[in-house]
Amino acid sequence: MKVRSIGFTKKVANLLALIVFGGVMPNAVAQSNYFVSSSSGDDKNNGLTVSNPWASMSRVSQEVLRPGDTVYFKSGDRFTGQLVIDESGTALAPIHFSAYGKGDLPVIDGAEMPGGAPLASVLIVDQDHLELSKLNIKNFRKKKRNGVVDTDAYGVLVKNTGKRNLRGYNFHDLVVEDIFPIQARKSFNKTSVTGIRFETHPAKSKKSAYNTGDIYIHNNFLRHTARFGIALRHGSSHIKGVRGSVSDYDVDVRIINNRCEDTGGTCVLFNGVWNGLLEKNSFIRSGAMVEPNLSVNRGSGAWFFRSKNIVAQHNVAIGSRGHNDSAGMHVDFGNENVLVQYNFSFDNEGYGTEILGKNKNVIWRYNISVHDGTRLVGVERPEGGKSSFPGKTLFVSDFSKPKRIQSKDIYIYNNTYVIAASSDPLVELNGRDMHLWNNLFVVDDGGRMGAKVTVGWQGGKVLDMQGNVFSGDVSPNFIRLDSNPVIAVIGFDGPPDKPETYAVDSAQFGTNRTGVAINHPIFRASGKGIFSHVAAEPEFDIFYNAIGSGLDVVGAGYRNKDLVLQP
């Protein structure tokens, strides 16, 4: 108690000094580096040098950190308890938490906190301009803590309670793993357990309409969580004048070059995001049963809900499992202006392409889907129960809440779909103004596609389908929907889980191989902000062949003598 009293007094004194001098002489206080070592430190040290480190995270939390300060945790050490970050940096001088020394990343494990496991190992409430790097964050909660629900757990939790706009988060080179609650929730949709989570409260008035933005999460490794790897959720406001405005969304979110594997649920969720970029990530075995009694056991590499201006490109999704969803990626309901391109998905049992209801302008192009949509109904599943949601190669649904509403302006073109032997995926197309152009559908020997084909109609124009190529046992009912189909014999030779295997030799098409001319739909947010590198219209296929250079235009991409795959 004596040490805490001293720390509290120092914190108050430092805070008063900042109030008195901070606004007048913002550069008068030098930026400081602090060092923390659980193996050799002492909280009575000044913490300013490697030879005089603090020992605990509670000591870190007592210090008033200033913009530009850095707190270094010693590599190879283990820190038990919760890191509470209750100061903000600035745009030019963020506060940084990282590692020093050689060895394994320092471990921050909230689950071992005295008095019971906290909600999150790293907790940030209403603070911004922060950087986290080179830390191993865990929180497998097993001991109850007063005032903390047993059914939630987070590695890093960032909360915006609606006091102001929050900006500037740079989280990189982290390992976030083993994030599980004490007990599971019964409701799938109410389960929010996450490795890295941003949560923004919905506005209760126009004056409190704030959001969180400038979020950059990159080069991290996430695994073993009860549901999400990374999740961003801005609660939807019911206030007129706020609902649907940019203040009702988190803004400018970049999720780049992360690897996420063996999560109980989805690797990445965008819920209420305005301008979101999902690029060069790997989603491996979402819906995994690492801790089946604590997890939702229902995946999808990534999905988007109630969001605007979303780009998902150059991602890989492999091995999603679950009784529902479990696609490589899917567009849930209530989105607008979504571009999904240049992605590779393999062995995701739910769907090859999944787009639910109440969406506007969804563009799905130059993707490769291999052996997706294999889920069977009416058979016992590894997690228990039986699924009533059969696997589908194409799944455009009108599902939304509170009522079903068809999506409109759906463009699915120049994709390659490969259907696995011994699988029998269905097709459902239930939307308005849908376009299926120049896709390549190849069924491996022993497989079948489209035994049941459903096309929904509620009035108006439904389906414009032309220029697609079909190989193998594809339902005549599906082929007949195409006004200009091509039947071919296509085979692939190479590792099934490598995208380059599906770079088609254009000679296999003979003389009927060019598909139909396309007026490309426009991604309206291209060329500016976080989308400055995203073209409004595609300039190349998935294998970086220039579009319009005389190469064929069926499927996601072609092999040619000059083909060089990008990293």
Enumerate the language-model features and the residues they cover:
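Surface beta-loop-beta hairpin patches that serve as ligand-binding interfaces in beta-rich domains
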Residues: R480, I490-P567
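Beta-solenoid repeat scaffold
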Residues: N33, E63-D109, L123-L135, R164-V175
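Acidic Gly/Asp/Thr-rich repetitive segments characteristic of extracellular carbohydrate-active
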Residues: S38-K74, R78, G115-P118, F543-L551
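Acidic glycine-/aspartate-rich tracts in secreted/extracellular proteins
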Residues: S39-K44, G76-R78, G89, G101-D104, ...
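Bacterial N-terminal signal peptides
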Residues: A13-V24
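Boundary at the C-terminal end of the N-terminal hydrophobic targeting segment
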Residues: A28-S32
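Glycine- and acidic/polar-rich repeat regions and solenoidal domains
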Residues: Q82, P114-I124, K138-R167, E177-D214, ...
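N-terminal secretory signal peptides that target proteins for export/translocation
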Residues: M1-T9
